């Protein structure tokens, strides 16, 4: 078991080598992206060895400590926790990133700053690995903030576009709201347990304490885009497609769920936090599934499906099954990265067109991408014996036998069936029917960088679920065996979604709305949430500040206080000290009457 830290460290050294060799100016050469891709592939191969050793060893965790510094009574160490979660997630993240980097060599080929782009992708991956291997809150916070700042830089990669800048700022602001909860939880743990080591926190913190767990839940809501802090996730589609694939598959968005999995020993004895997590996840998965139904941007549909799956992971943690949430994180990474890469292939082939209404008939011109997109969509919906089935089936089985919050579980079932609806919609609009794009577009997918990357993820989307689930040790008591009619519920929910999608598409194919319905507008405008939150408060605050400045500064001080008040004071003073009333017209009239009478008497 002493080999585990060494092999993991070797994997990290291989990963960081392209950055460590910066003094040699290697990052200025044309081959730097290939060096980075090779480093990630070698790191993946090395990381498979400790994962295999650990799975067959039967150990619970291996912890490596290097003392760093002591501040009064607080001891800070570089501490790595190599347990099932970190050692399984590392190869998954490295494998997916390897494929994404190979895809980026094709997709970002014409970008003049491709070397910097690959360096950012590599740093993004390194900070995520720091986060998952951390054994104390200090290291975890470094990884947490690292993925945050790298997401900001990558979402705003095309900084010449206003939308990209706005999306990057939006991601940063929403994550700062979540970070408030994380920092508050860190402060609470330091105050009450005098340590940031996870084992000491689990031993010393009372199990029923809700305050720090609320902070951690807020942090997870911000990072994993749960309802209320969700708008940044679809906006992040303004970044390049490889960024979307990496962001949504194995790095930033799953960091919040991973944080709650790490702290599940505290959460499992706290029913109020579990219920809150369950309700937040259920609302998120339903709301984002509804929003995905009417979107027309192919990347935004896949982004909302990510948010819906994150809600499902939160529901799984809420029913006290963190190992199933982790299994879904791992399986979800493969097919979600592949779906984004397929959408990138379509967008690139159609001249940066992202509207699914302007696609169609691509199954003839892009057969390989079509195959991958259909397999990815089926895996996302939970089709039996594809990767997504092994996690979604277990999650729905656990939900069916759970006794908490029937309404939350019911809306999660509804949202799961909607997964099949929007997946079918993507297939129907992009691949089937007649072409709706300009005829002079040159479509070509015969590039090894594209096909090899998608092939690897396609194999992962078929076989990875079986391999990971067969080596999954449950961290909590698994649900009991259930009757066959409940066992087939996952398949029934998926088939119901497919049937509903086909029925709706055939029913509404020739249907034209003069005015969109309220339900359609609610879904298409994202529940009016961006309008209410992003426009109304700024409008109200700007109006208030303008009124205050114009009323207090201009009207009160510059107008009423000095000029008008001086005139008013002089007028009232002259009125007070004067003998006459100042009625000039009356005086002239009396003078005229007297003059007239005098003239009449004289004449």
Swiss-Prot record:
Top-level enzyme category: translocase
Subcellular localization(s) per the UniProt record: Mitochondrion inner membrane
Keyword flag Ribosomal protein: no
GO molecular function: NADH dehydrogenase (ubiquinone) activity
Catalysed reaction equations from the record: a ubiquinone + NADH + 5 H(+)(in) = a ubiquinol + NAD(+) + 4 H(+)(out)
Keyword Transferase applies: no
Membrane topology note: Multi-pass membrane protein
GO biological processes: ATP synthesis coupled electron transport; electron transport coupled proton transport
Disulphide connectivity of cysteines: none
Pfam families, alphabetized: NADH5_C (PF06455), Proton_antipo_M (PF00361), Proton_antipo_N (PF00662)
Record keywords: Electron transport, Membrane, Mitochondrion, Mitochondrion inner membrane, NAD, Respiratory chain, Translocase, Transmembrane, Transmembrane helix, Transport, Ubiquinone
A cellular component annotation (GO) from this entry: mitochondrial inner membrane
InterPro entries on file: NADH_DH_su5_C, NADHpl_OxRdtase_5_subgr, ND/Mrp_TM, NU5C-like, Proton_antipo_N
Membrane-spanning intervals of the chain: 4-24, 38-58, 87-107, 117-137, 140-160, 171-191, 211-233, 241-261, 273-293, 301-320, 331-351, 366-386, 409-429, 457-477, 488-508, 583-603
E.C. number: 7.1.1.2
Function comment: Core subunit of the mitochondrial membrane respiratory chain NADH dehydrogenase (Complex I) that is believed to belong to the minimal assembly required for catalysis. Complex I functions in the transfer of electrons from NADH to the respiratory chain. The immediate electron acceptor for the enzyme is believed to be ubiquinone.
Family membership: Belongs to the complex I subunit 5 family.
Protein name: NADH-ubiquinone oxidoreductase chain 5
Naturally occurring in which organism (per UniProt): Dugong dugon (Dugong)
Lineage, opening ranks: Eukaryota, Metazoa, Chordata, Craniata, Vertebrata
